[in-house]
């Protein structure tokens, strides 16, 4: 008789290929055989990071628009919205993490690979503006393939707009914490992902600009086994810490407590 649960679904682990029952992935979505971390949805990430019932979404009316008339983009947006239950690739709100208040922005790679576009840009701008207005720390959890090609230069301009707003945030005592999760690539890694006062990489995350396959097709080089990994970035001083997923919440809570900004501003 099989020792696996009788009901539920199975999935092949993207890394080791073993078949894993949905219950075996556990709360933190980790393969029990090779310890590969599944990519989380926004809902899963919020459940793991914030104090229960504390997340309050910011009011945001920005919606994606097919400004360039890109073929089939509108249909792809509708499909992504239907499959994820989101209307864009980032969710922003106020939250408590270990009883420490903050503004939290969480990107979702399940929505068109979490790509940066006009609507995502405006939401991140609003999150930073609210951090300044409410005198709260800002945490951005990145999960993105980069800029959204269907919005062309509009998506690229978003990189600079976000950097300009984060410069205004940096002129205040308010901290910016970036949490780099799998994947953090392209225009997101090239712009705001590494602008944090504290930069945390989730263990196992792939972080870089161009993907390894693109680089190897362009340059006749053999890339190291740990290329574009969280551990490699830590070894080279690009991130402040590599944290396992189960420890992320307590790590962020301790960091917020050390800064002491949100609690002092809100009693």
Curated annotation (Swiss-Prot):
Q: Where in the cell is it found?
A: Cytoplasm
The similarity comment for this entry is:
Belongs to the AccD/PCCB family.
Q: Name one GO biological process term.
A: fatty acid biosynthetic process
Q: Which residues bind Zn(2+)?
A: 13, 16, 31, 34
Q: Which gene encodes it?
A: accD1
Swiss-Prot/TrEMBL keywords: ATP-binding, Cytoplasm, Fatty acid biosynthesis, Fatty acid metabolism, Lipid biosynthesis, Lipid metabolism, Metal-binding, Nucleotide-binding, Transferase, Zinc, Zinc-finger
- Quaternary data: Acetyl-CoA carboxylase is a heterohexamer composed of biotin carboxyl carrier protein (AccB), biotin carboxylase (AccC) and two subunits each of ACCase subunit alpha (AccA) and ACCase subunit beta (AccD).
Protein name, per record: Acetyl-coenzyme A carboxylase carboxyl transferase subunit beta 1
Q: Which residues form the CoA carboxyltransferase N-terminal domain?
A: 9-267
Q: Which GO terms describe its molecular function?
A: acetyl-CoA carboxylase activity; ATP binding; carboxyl- or carbamoyltransferase activity; zinc ion binding
Query: What is the cofactor note?
Result: Binds 1 zinc ion per subunit.
- List zinc finger spans: C4-type: 13-34
**Protein task:** Component of the acetyl coenzyme A carboxylase (ACC) complex. Biotin carboxylase (BC) catalyzes the carboxylation of biotin on its carrier protein (BCCP) and then the CO(2) group is transferred by the transcarboxylase to acetyl-CoA to form malonyl-CoA.
Cofactor(s) named in the record: Zn(2+)
